Amino acid sequence: METQLLREQAIFPSKEVLRDALGNVYPVLEDLETRLSENEFALTFEWHYYKDSKGWLCKVCHKKKTIFWLSVWDGFFKTSFFFLERHLEGIAALNIAENSFVIEKEWGKMIPLVFNISSQKQISDLLKVIGFKKVSK
């Protein structure tokens, strides 16, 4: 069963806390954050505690646009994108492995696309979706 971590409001998810929580998956997150913070993507990572979900979530943004949400789980981190139905054709054209993500039940008009990231091999598909989300309207 999947267990979400980072539930304590008083404990901010610093690099040390993330390293302890993710173990050998932490270098994957660290590399992703470095790559996404650089000029090509220029994304920012904003950690906030959300009382409704009772946990820390990271909102990853380009300027004011939310690109994806990141949460930390036991053995992996989860990236959740929210798309409209009109974006599905563009996502299908990205040529990403079908087993690398899950499209979850619609949430209002939004369709969640979720990656459970546990290895560096998954990052190339994730970067394709990030690039698509960044330019989609």
Predicted regions, residues:
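Generic structural signal of hydrophobic/aromatic residues within well-ordered alpha-helices
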Residues: L18, L22, A97-F101, L126
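Short, conserved beta-strand/beta-arch hydrophobic-aromatic motifs that form part
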Residues: H48-K109
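Well-ordered alpha/beta subsegment
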Residues: T3, S100-K137
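Exposed alpha-helical structural elements
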Residues: V17, D31, A93, Q122-D125
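Charge-rich, low-complexity N-terminal segments
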Residues: M1-E38, L43, Y50-K51
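Charged, low-complexity, helix/coiled-coil-prone segments
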Residues: E2-L5, L36-S37, T66-K78, L113-I117
